[in-house]
Regions:
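Terminal leader/tail segments of proteins
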Residues: 1-119
Length: 119
């Protein structure tokens, strides 16, 4: 486990905007409680609460990855409109202590689904 610091900063802030996630016109998530995670030089990622996500459209997959700063990630596919978008969502169900704010949140790959921030 590594801790965020000057060489690899990670910040988590409440997003004041509404965040809507869709796939093929189907709303997967819609929230005013998203968290914006900024990590080093990577693009910002919106983490959406599970409670604001239509979990009935998601199917857990066997894929897992490990981040030395956040922990082990689990993945979901979106199943909507008869189509499956493989491993389009990840989540840290038991993140490392420095990242506990993202517990219970989902992140979405912007090249697989549409993520909109609405004022």
């Amino acid at each position: 486990m590594k801790l965020p610091g000057p060489d690899h900063p990670i910040t988590i802030t409440a997003n004041p905007k509404r965040v809507r996630v869709t796939a093929g016109g189907v709303v997967i998530a819609d929230t005013t409680h998203a968290l914006t995670l900024k990590e080093a030089s990577y693009p910002a990622v919106q983490y959406v609460p599970r409670g604001d996500t239509n979990m009935a459209l998601l199917a857990r997959t066997d894929r897992t990855t490990h981040c030395p700063y956040k922990g082990d990630a689990s993945y979901f596919s979106v199943v909507a409109d008869g189509k499956t978008i493989e491993n389009s969502i990840w989540t840290y169900e038991t993140p490392f202590p420095a990242m506990t704010e993202i517990t219970g949140h989902l992140a979405f790959y912007p090249d697989k689904v549409k993520i909109e921030e609405v004022a």
